């Protein structure tokens, strides 16, 4: 089997599993990448991410160019045609190669009889491309987001929703966190320059560096030795607001994959940290991160709603709750989120967040700090959540972040800045 020929069909199968079966791309893609040569892995990733980023447009084009949708066992061909459109619109793959390889993909998915159909649709698109794209530019699909999410963003951000959508449709910058126990940020930036790369410090987060051009981690000075970690700037804000101190008992709840756990220990190496997550499989990445950075923490599997099951009656000086959320602030990194989430999920997530907040608040010592964080931009999960929590929790007070009417700090995704993130810093009276 020609691996190069198979690339397009693998991408089509990955997108189908996300859209039709509700699988996350981070679970679907790695096993498929094992089926292609190393030199082809980047292209496979680009095709999967790109098709999911522009899915609304590609779906719109198929509806314009085909009289009826592909269904049943032929459904993968629907996504194979999308992969073809994406290459013609957004990649440097020569058009003749894009067509030939995509058409050949029908053989890999055991649909060789549909090669002529695929070829015909792609060539029809080439002939009508300018007219079709002009029409698309005035359609509702042009936002590249599901309609329910566009409406929620319009309601929440009447003057900024388009900026958020544009940011979500861009490729994300690559942010790093310099391990302050090994190097100062300026010192590591010097090592980066010596390696022929350039980075820029974040003005607000003292460990954050943005690479001018994304690079593989093995090319970063000292990555294997734990000198630096890949972590978005906004995610680094969690430890900044938490302000952990040596000797404190700290709970990092919903901790996987461990980026925030290790950041806490970089800021306060002698803190006693308990990292808890409900997903046992993802906890393996917490262990991996601790090992790479040479750090120690207690790691437990547990549900945030039932702290007695994983910490008994223990109380903590500080709690970081990176709550389960819609992840609508990190769509540019995970474009599958747009198609995995449903409108009804938001109410269910807000209810879960409230239950976890109420369950862990008694575990915070008087005078202690709880930082509530999400990678969402939706008020129901953020400001509204904290506002109602403050109303029902008389011993909770807001600190540093916002006002009682507008509690918390909301970062919006954009350009070279960090992802969409929300933080609220609460003090126990």
Curated annotation (Swiss-Prot):
An individual GO BP term: rRNA base methylation
Location relative to the cell: Cytoplasm
Polar residues composition-biased segments: 400-412
Domain of life, source organism: Bacteria
Annotated positions binding S-adenosyl-L-methionine: 254-260, 277, 303, 322
Pfam family, one: Methyltr_RsmB-F
Molecular functions (GO terms): RNA binding; rRNA (cytosine-C5-)-methyltransferase activity
GO CC annotations, alphabetized: cytosol
Cited InterPro entries: MeTrfase_RsmB-F_NOP2_cat (IPR049560), MeTrfase_RsmB-F_NOP2_dom (IPR001678), NusB-like_sf (IPR035926), NusB_RsmB_TIM44 (IPR006027), RCMT (IPR023267), rRNA_ssu_MeTfrase_B (IPR004573), rRNA_ssu_MeTfrase_B_ent (IPR023541), RsmB-like_ferredoxin (IPR054728)
Catalytic activity, EC: 2.1.1.176
Region (Disordered): 397-419
Described purpose of this protein according to its UniProt entry: Specifically methylates the cytosine at position 967 (m5C967) of 16S rRNA.
Protein name: Ribosomal RNA small subunit methyltransferase B
Organism of this sequence: Salmonella dublin (strain CT_02021853)
Native organism taxonomy: Bacteria, Pseudomonadati, Pseudomonadota, Gammaproteobacteria, Enterobacterales
Gene: rsmB
């Amino acid at each position: 089997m020609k691996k190069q020929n198979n690339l397009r069909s693998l991408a089509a199968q990955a997108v189908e599993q996300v859209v039709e079966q509700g699988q996350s791309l981070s679970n679907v893609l790695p096993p498929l990448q094992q089926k292609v040569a190393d030199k082809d892995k980047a292209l496979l990733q680009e095709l999967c991410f790109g098709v999911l980023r522009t899915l609304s447009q590609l779906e719109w084009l198929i509806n314009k160019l085909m009289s009826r949708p592909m269904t049943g066992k032929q459904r993968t061909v629907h996504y194979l045609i999308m992969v073809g459109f994406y290459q013609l619109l957004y990649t440097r793959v020569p058009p003749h190669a894009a067509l030939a390889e995509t058409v050949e993909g029908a053989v890999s998915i055991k649909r060789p009889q549909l090669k002529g159909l695929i070829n015909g649709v792609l060539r029809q698109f080439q002939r009508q491309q300018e007219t079709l794209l002009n029409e698309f530019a005035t359609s509702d699909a042009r936002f590249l987001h599901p309609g329910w999410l566009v409406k929620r963003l319009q309601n929440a951000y009447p003057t900024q929703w388009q900026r958020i959508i544009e940011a979500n449709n861009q490729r994300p910058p690559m942010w790093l966190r310099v391990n302050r126990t090994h190097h100062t940020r300026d010192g590591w930036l010097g090592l980066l320059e010596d390696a022929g790369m350039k980075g820029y410090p974040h003005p607000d987060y003292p460990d954050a560096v943005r690479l001018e051009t994304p690079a593989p981690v093995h090319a970063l000075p000292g990555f294997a030795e734990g000198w630096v970690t890949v972590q978005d700037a906004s995610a680094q804000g969690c430890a900044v607001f938490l302000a952990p101190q040596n000797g404190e008992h700290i709970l990092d709840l919903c901790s996987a994959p461990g980026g925030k756990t290790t950041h806490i220990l970089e800021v306060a190496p002698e803190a006693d940290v308990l990292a808890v997550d409900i997903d046992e499989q993802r906890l393996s990445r917490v262990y991996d991160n601790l090992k790479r950075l040479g750090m120690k923490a207690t790691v437990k599997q547990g549900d945030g709603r039932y702290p007695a099951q994983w910490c008994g009656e223990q109380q903590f000086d500080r709690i970081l709750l990176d709550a389960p959320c819609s992840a609508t602030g990190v769509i540019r990194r995970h474009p599958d989120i747009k198609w995995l989430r449903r409108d009804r999920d938001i109410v269910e997530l807000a209810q879960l967040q409230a239950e976890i907040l109420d369950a862990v608040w008694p575990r915070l010592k008087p005078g202690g700090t709880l930082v509530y964080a999400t990678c969402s931009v939706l008020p129901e999960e953020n400001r509204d959540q904290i506002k109602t929590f403050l109303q029902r929790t008389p011993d909770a007070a807001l600190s540093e972040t916002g006002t009682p009417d507008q509690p918390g700090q909301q970062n919006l995704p954009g350009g070279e800045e960090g992802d969409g993130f929300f933080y609220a810093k609460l003090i126990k009276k």
